[in-house]
């Protein structure tokens, strides 16, 4: 009898199960879009091609549809910043640029308190809270041969910086 139950449990078929949030995930996060996208067959989900808006789609002329390697949405969160605009303040592609044009003067700086280890304002802080993977054990012991090129955090324990400021939208 246990073999019968074991066979039924293993042979369960959930391919017809649909959740209410499936369409949301497909539209916003490209989950379940295509097996080719996640299998690495010529398209790496972490590559630049998956984060650049399709120039043909912008004009309504993309013939590839779902098979296109580029984004078919104008989502600012997924677009990488334009290197030329960030460096020079202008881009020769102008409005047709496939990358995000961020104004360097409006960029938010890194929070000095968070870099020291803890920011008392937490999510309402005005600065960026950039995580480093973990403290470098060699640096904590006294010396890290990699210096600033070390992938781990080198915490700076100095006098506290100026008091952190709250975000304007809070």
Swiss-Prot record:
One of its GO terms (cellular component) is mRNA cleavage and polyadenylation specificity factor complex. Gene3D superfamilies: Zinc finger, CCCH-type. It comes from the Eukaryota. One of its GO terms (biological process) is co-transcriptional mRNA 3'-end processing, cleavage and polyadenylation pathway. Component of the cleavage factor I (CF I) involved in pre-mRNA 3'-end processing. Its main location: nucleus. This is mRNA 3'-end-processing protein yth1. PANTHER family: CLEAVAGE AND POLYADENYLATION SPECIFICITY FACTOR SUBUNIT 4, CLEAVAGE AND POLYADENYLATION SPECIFICITY FACTOR SUBUNIT 4-RELATED. The keyword Endoplasmic reticulum does not apply. A zinc finger (C3H1-type) spans 48-75, 76-104, 105-130, 131-157. It comes from Schizosaccharomyces pombe (strain 972 / ATCC 24843) (Fission yeast). Belongs to the CPSF4/YTH1 family. It is found in: Nucleus.
């Amino acid at each position: 009898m246990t073999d019968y139950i074991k066979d039924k449990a293993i042979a369960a078929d959930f391919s017809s199960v649909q959740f209410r949030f499936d369409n949301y995930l497909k539209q916003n996060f490209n989950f379940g879009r295509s097996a080719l996208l996640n299998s690495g067959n010529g398209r790496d989900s972490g590559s630049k091609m998956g984060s650049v808006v399709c120039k043909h789609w912008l004009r309504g002329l993309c013939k590839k549809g779902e098979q296109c390697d580029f984004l078919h949405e104008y989502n600012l969160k997924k677009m990488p910043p334009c290197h030329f605009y960030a460096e020079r303040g202008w881009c020769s592609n102008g409005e047709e640029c496939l990358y995000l044009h961020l104004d360097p003067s409006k960029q938010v700086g890194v929070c000095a308190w968070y870099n020291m280890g803890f920011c008392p304002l937490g999510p309402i802080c005005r600065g960026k809270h950039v995580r480093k993977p973990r403290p470098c054990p060699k640096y904590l012991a006294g010396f890290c041969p990699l210096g600033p090129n070390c992938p781990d955090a080198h915490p700076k324990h100095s006098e506290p910086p100026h008091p952190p400021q709250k975000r304007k939208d809070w």
